[in-house]
Every structure is written in structure tokens, then in C-alpha cells.
């Protein structure tokens, strides 16, 4: 069975050296596809020959792409990376927390550390920033695609059987097309909308981050113009004809092109999950320029695409009632804490379950040694149940040794996370007790 999961957490500083042995992401996510590459094509020279005669390492412009299904708990991290403004409001009691994101004028966007597993090893990425984000839905799942640029990476081998995933502490239902509703110009659009697409780009200026003395980016890439394009697909019929003509001619009710006007409308996308109504998402584009495209072939239904380009001249109202001028605003209600860098070293409990075949092994010593500090160890002996409980273990990566006379010593690695830590170990009997 493959292990292909993506982990993400905000950095305190761009591209800071990250001790991944002591690092735990905010969550792990099973993604549909992932591709991280260094973009380090070599510099080649022919020196007048028909063949290459010299080659040297070229510049590194690392890029990545992650694609998957959207769920309410995790999608906030992607909006945190794409948009420059963020506000968190804690819920009262057991109520939902509110995360608000909107586009402003700040060119310095958040950066992240990330991990991506590839069955037998994982890439450890620093200085990761979202250059582009896409959401798309038609008649299946609401999907996302995120394009990243990053500073550099490292790799380490992993034990896929004992890889410790950070599990969500709340429902993470993947969103479907029937969870999504759209309002155009503050009302339900006429007719049936068969698909919606959002595409946003930050146009991060990577070229200016690479200079003398280093192959890879040396400073954070600043965002340039934010481009946001939207599209709704519908069909031309009696219900949608008026909307299509309004968009084409630039005025509501017009039957010929406007002399000077272009139609500006808000578009709002809301997500309400049938099985989980407390968790919600609203995406508002306060003011958009609207354009339509349509044609026909033979007797086929006339498909119409309503294209919208966002303007930074509309207003959105925050939860506290204040207003902001923006081209895009997102509100998410879930149980996730504020999206921010880690500031405190947490501890957790590790429960080791030691067996040999169907036998529970009593009296086995389970020892955890800090991966970066061999002097820091934590150990416990298994009870008659074969279970050893080790408390107050700081989060991070550890070397694992499990030993008992009459069995071969088990060695491996394990990452302690802020959550459930179940370590399953299978010992093999050995007459020599090795």
C-alpha cells in the first residue's frame, strides 16, 4: 500500500532552517496528485562542437503542484497562502471558529514548511508559497489545484507502516457539487449552472530572489498583480437568455450594445454540507466585470460560458461588521485553531503495542531516542497486555528500539504528533535472543 500524503504548516520566517525531526504539520492530507521538482536544468556548452563539451549545475527554481478534493477544515490553509489578509475569531463555548481571508495590497505573502511522502521517502520543503490556486466543480467533487514556489528541499526515508499521520479532530467531508450554491448579482442565477471555476494567480517574482553566491532563492518572492478569473457554464434557453444578453450588451435589460457601460456584478459562492450544517464556507467576489461566450454546432444545445474578472473596488463586510475594499473575500466556519506558526513545544503520550504473532509480549523494553539528540531518551516496559505507555514525550522524530531476551531487537523510526500515537511493533522470536 502506498503512502502519499501532504503536510503543511506556516513558517515563522521565510525559508527558516526547519528541524523536521521536531516538526509536526497542522494536518496531513491525502491528495490526488503532487509534483515537487527543483527546476535545476544544467547549463551546457558546446564550445564550437556539434556535441556538448561542458556542463555545470544551473539555477534552481523549485516549483510544486498539489491537487485534491476540498474539505472545510483544510482549505483554509490554501486561502491563507493565496490571500494576504487574515482574521481569526474564536467561537464561544463549543461553537465554530471563524476564519476570514481577503485580498489586500500587501506583497509579502505567508510561507510554509511542507512534507510530501512518496511511499518510501518524504520530501521536506521550506519556503513554500502559493503562486496560483484553482477551484473547480461540475458534477462530482469540488477540487483544488495549488501551484507552489519554494526555497529548497531535503529528503529522508520513511517507514510507511508506522508513519504517524496527523488526523483531523473534526469532520473532513469532501465537498460535492450539490453542497455548492452560486448567487450572481445578489440573486440565484436563471437556469441551471453546470460548472464553476475559480482561478487565481499571485505572479510571484522568483527571478528577483536569486543572485550571486547561491543556486536557490535567497529571499522571499514578492507578489505582483493578483489575477482572479471566474467562469460559470450554463445553457442558452428562455430562462438564461436575459442574463446572457445583459452580460453581452453591458446593461441590465439592454437589447443592443451599450454606448459606454460594462456590466459589473457581485458573485457569491456558498457551501453548506447536508451531513454537517455547522461547518460553512462563503466566497465573495464583490465586484466583477461580466462577459459571455456562446456558439452552436448543428442542433446541439447552445452552451454558454459566463466569464468574470474581479475588480478591487467592491466592499465585503467582516464578521465584526467592519468593511474592507477587496477583490475576494472568504469566510470559513470550522473547529480549526488560528492558522499561524508553531510557538510552543507540545508533549504527547505514546502507546506501544508489542506482539509476536498472536502473542502479547510482556516485559519488552520500548525505548524512544530523540533523532537529533541521542542523550534524550524515553522508555517503558510492556505489561501483560503487551502494552507500554510512555507519557510526556515532546513532539518530533525518534529512533525506536524494542528488545526482550528471546526475540530479535526491533529498530525503526517514529514521529510523535499532537494527537493519538499508537506504535505497533511485531517481534520475531530468536533462540539466540538477538
Predicted regions and their residues:
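Structured interaction patches on ligand/partner-binding surfaces of diverse proteins
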Residues: 405-431
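Signature of extracytoplasmic/envelope-associated structural regions
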Residues: 1-349, 353-358, 366-368, 380-382, ...
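Low-complexity "stalk/linker" and mucin-like segments enriched in Ser/Thr/Pro/Ala/Gly
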Residues: 372-379
Amino acid at each position: 500500500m502506498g503512502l502519499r500524503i501532504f503536510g503543511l504548516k506556516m513558517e515563522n520566517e521565510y525559508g527558516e532552517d526547519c528541524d523536521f525531526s521536531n516538526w509536526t504539520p497542522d494536518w496531513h492530507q491525502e491528495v490526488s496528485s503532487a509534483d515537487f521538482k527543483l527546476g535545476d536544468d544544467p547549463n551546457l556548452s558546446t564550445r564550437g562542437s556539434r556535441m556538448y563539451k561542458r556542463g555545470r549545475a544551473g539555477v534552481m527554481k523549485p516549483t510544486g503542484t498539489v491537487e485534491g478534493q476540498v474539505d472545510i477544515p483544510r482549505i483554509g490553509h490554501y486561502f491563507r497562502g493565496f490571500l494576504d489578509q487574515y482574521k481569526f475569531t474564536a467561537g464561544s463555548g463549543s461553537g465554530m471558529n471563524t476564519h476570514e481571508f481577503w485580498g489586500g495590497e500587501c506583497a509579502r505573502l505567508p510561507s510554509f514548511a511542507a512534507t510530501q511522502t512518496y511511499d518510501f521517502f518524504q520530501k521536506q520543503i521550506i519556503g513554500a508559497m502559493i503562486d496560483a490556486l484553482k477551484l473547480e466543480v461540475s458534477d462530482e467533487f469540488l477540487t483544488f489545484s495549488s501551484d507552489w514556489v519554494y526555497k529548497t528541499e531535503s529528503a529522508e526515508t520513511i517507514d510507511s507502516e508506522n508513519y504517524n499521520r496527523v488526523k483531523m479532530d473534526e469532520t473532513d467531508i469532501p465537498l460535492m457539487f450539490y453542497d455548492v450554491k452560486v448567487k450572481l448579482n445578489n440573486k440565484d442565477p436563471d437556469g441551471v449552472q453546470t460548472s464553476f471555476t475559480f482561478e487565481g494567480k499571485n505572479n510571484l517574482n522568483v527571478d528577483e530572489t536569486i543572485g550571486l553566491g547561491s543556486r536557490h532563492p535567497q529571499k522571499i518572492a514578492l507578489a505582483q498583480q493578483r489575477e482572479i478569473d471566474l467562469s460559470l457554464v450554463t445553457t442558452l434557453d428562455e430562462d438564461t437568455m436575459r442574463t446572457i444578453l445583459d452580460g453581452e450588451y453591458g446593461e441590465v435589460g439592454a437589447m443592443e450594445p451599450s454606448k459606454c457601460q460594462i456590466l459589473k456584478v457581485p458573485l457569491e459562492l456558498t457551501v453548506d454540507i447536508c451531513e454537517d450544517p455547522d461547518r460553512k464556507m462563503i466566497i465573495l467576489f464583490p465586484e466583477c466585470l461580466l462577459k459571455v461566450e456562446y456558439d452552436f454546432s448543428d442542433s446541439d444545445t447552445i452552451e454558454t460560458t459566463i466569464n468574470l474578472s474581479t475588480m478591487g473596488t467592491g466592499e465585503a463586510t467582516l464578521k465584526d461588521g467592519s468593511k474592507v475594499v477587496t477583490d475576494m473575500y472568504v469566510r470559513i466556519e470550522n473547529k480549526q485553531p488560528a492558522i499561524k506558526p508553531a510557538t510552543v513545544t507540545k508533549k504527547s503520550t505514546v502507546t506501544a503495542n508489542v506482539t509476536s504473532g498472536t502473542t502479547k509480549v510482556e516485559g519488552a523494553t520500548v525505548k524512544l531516542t530523540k533523532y537529533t539528540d541521542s542523550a534524550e531518551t524515553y522508555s517503558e516496559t510492556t505489561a501483560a497486555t503487551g502494552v507500554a505507555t510512555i507519557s510526556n514525550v515532546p513532539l518530533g522524530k525518534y529512533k525506536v528500539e524494542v528488545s526482550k531476551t528471546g526475540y530479535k531487537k526491533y529498530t525503526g523510526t517514529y514521529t510523535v504528533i499532537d494527537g493519538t500515537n499508537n506504535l505497533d511493533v511485531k517481534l520475531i522470536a530468536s533462540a539466540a535472543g538477538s
